[in-house]
Amino acid sequence: MSDASSTAPSQAGATSQSTGSRTLLDKIWDQHLVHAPESGPAIIYIDLHLVHEVTSPQAFEGLRINNRPVRRPERTIATPDHNVPTSDRSLPIADPISRKQIETLRENCKEFGVQLFDIDDVRQGIVHVIGPENGYTQPGMTIVCGDSHTATHGAFGSLAFGIGTSEVEHVLATQTLLQFKPKTFELRVDGELARGVTAKDMILYLIGQIGTAGGTGYVLEFTGDAVRNLTMEERMTVCNMSIEAGARAGMIAPDQTTFDYLRGRPECPADFDAAVEAWKKLPSDPGATYDRSNLYKGSDIRPQVTWGTNPGQVCSVDSVVPSPGDSTDVNVQKSTASALQYMDLKAGTPITEIEINRVFIGSCTNARIEDLRAAAAVIKGHHCSDKVNAMIVPGSGKVKLQAEEEGLHKVFTDAGFDWREAGCSMCLAMNPDKLAPGERCASTSNRNFEGRQGKGGRTHLVSPAMAAAAAIKGHFVDIRDWDYR
C-alpha cells in the first residue's frame, strides 16, 4: 500500500468543481466524488476498508454467492479484535460463535486475497489502533469499517465513518459507497487544558455540552489551540467518540504533528515529502463556512466522569450526581431518573464517593502507548485496592511490545493490575472479559450503555489516569490532586 495516493483524486475519477473557500470535508468529498446526481445519494470512492470478524462474514458470503471478487484487496486490511481472548492464547477459543467468526475471517481473507493480521501476528490488534500505527491511515483519505468508532481515523484529517454489513459488501465489491454529504459542525476549543485534564475529558465534556444527538447529520471538525496542542494519539481519542455525539464522523485537520507521527511508518507513501505537500492543502480555508459552530474554553474543562447510561450523562469529578429535578425538561427528568436507578446512584452523592470494584484500561479510545504511560505514571509506587479487580489491555501487539520494552507492564503487575493481550476486551460483552451483574467499572472505553460491558454491569467512562487512580483508591478521585511518586 505504500505507493498508493492517499488523496486519491485520480482514483475517485472526479476532481473538484467547487469554487471559493472550502472546509476540510469539502475538499475530501470533492476529491472522492465519483458521481453526484441532482437528487439522491452521491457515489464516493473509498481509499481504505478496515475489516474485522463480526461484521464481515455475511458480506464475504454475499460476494461468494454472486461470484464477485474483492474489487481492491490491496486497499483492504483485516484483523480479529472484538471476539479475541486477551488471556492465554495458547488455549482454543472457548466460545463456539467467537471461534467460528475468527476462523471464518481467516478463510475469507485467504479466499479473497485480503491482508490479515491474525492473532499470532504482532500487528494484530484493535482495528482502529493498527490502522494508524502502521501508517495505513493517512490525511485526505476516505476510510470505512463495519464498526461505529471508525471516526477515530478522522484525527489524521480523513473522512472516516462506520458502515453496516450490506455496505461492507458494497465496498468490498466496488470500492465505492452511496452517501449523502453531511453538514459541517465546528467545535472550537481555545486556550489550554489544565494540568490533569486530558483529551478524554475534552471529548466527554463536549458531548455533555451538545448532547448525544447534538451532532446528528454532521461531521464534527475539532479546531482551536487546545485541539492543536494535542498529540496524535490524543486526537484519536477525541475523534473516536464523535459518534457518541450522534455525528457521522469527526475530523482534525492535518498539521506538522500529523506528519511527524506518520513519517517512517511502513505503509506511508514512498515519496513522503511529496505526500506532505499535498496534505498541507487539506485544512479548511480561511473564511470557510461551517453549517454550525460552537466555541469553548479549554480552561473550563475539568476531569470528567459519566454517571449515567449514555456518554452525555457526564459531569466533572469535583461535582455531585445530578437530580432529575435539575432540569425543567420532562424527557431529561425521565432519562435521569432511569439512569440513576440502573446505576444504583443517589442524586447529590459526590462523584468522589462513588466506589468501584472493576477497572478497565483499554479499547480503541484509550489503549495506545501514551494512554498506558499515563496510567503507569499514576500507578507507580502505589498498589491496586484489595476491593478492585483491574485489567490493562493494550490496543495492539505492537503497543504491548513497546510497553514491555519500556517496563510499563512491570509497573502494572507489581501494583496488582492484570496485564493482557491485545483486543477489544471489556469495551463490549462479546468476549470473556465481562462485568458481572451489579459490578461497577471505571472504564476508559467509549460507551456506558446498559449492559454494554456485561448484563447488569455499571460503567463509568473516564480517562486512563482517572481509571488508574480509582483502581488504587477504590473510588473516584480528582486526578489533579494525585500523589505522583
From Swiss-Prot:
Q: Hey, which pathway is this one from?
A: Amino-acid biosynthesis; L-leucine biosynthesis; L-leucine from 3-methyl-2-oxobutanoate: step 2/4
In the record, which residues are listed under signal peptide?
none
The cofactor(s) it depends on are:
[4Fe-4S] cluster
Gene Ontology biological process? L-leucine biosynthetic process
Q: Where is this region: Disordered?
A: 1-20, 73-92
Keywords attached to this Swiss-Prot or TrEMBL record, sorted alphabetically, are: 4Fe-4S, Amino-acid biosynthesis, Branched-chain amino acid biosynthesis, Iron, Iron-sulfur, Leucine biosynthesis, Lyase, Metal-binding
> GO terms for molecular function, please?
3-isopropylmalate dehydratase activity; 4 iron, 4 sulfur cluster binding; metal ion binding
The EC designation for this entry is: 4.2.1.33
Taxonomy, superkingdom: Bacteria
Cofactor note text: Binds 1 [4Fe-4S] cluster per subunit.
Q: Where does this protein hold [4Fe-4S] cluster?
A: C364, C424, C427
Q: Which reaction does it catalyse?
A: (2R,3S)-3-isopropylmalate = (2S)-2-isopropylmalate
Q: What PROSITE patterns does the record point to?
A: ACONITASE_1, ACONITASE_2
Q: Which NCBIfam families match?
A: leuC, PRK05478.1, PRK12466.1
Query: What is the recorded function of this protein according to its Swiss-Prot or TrEMBL entry?
Result: Catalyzes the isomerization between 2-isopropylmalate and 3-isopropylmalate, via the formation of 2-isopropylmaleate.
Oligomer and partners: Heterodimer of LeuC and LeuD.
Name the family.
Answer: Belongs to the aconitase/IPM isomerase family. LeuC type 1 subfamily.
Indicate what this protein is called per its UniProt record.
3-isopropylmalate dehydratase large subunit
This protein's species is Rhodopirellula baltica (strain DSM 10527 / NCIMB 13988 / SH1)
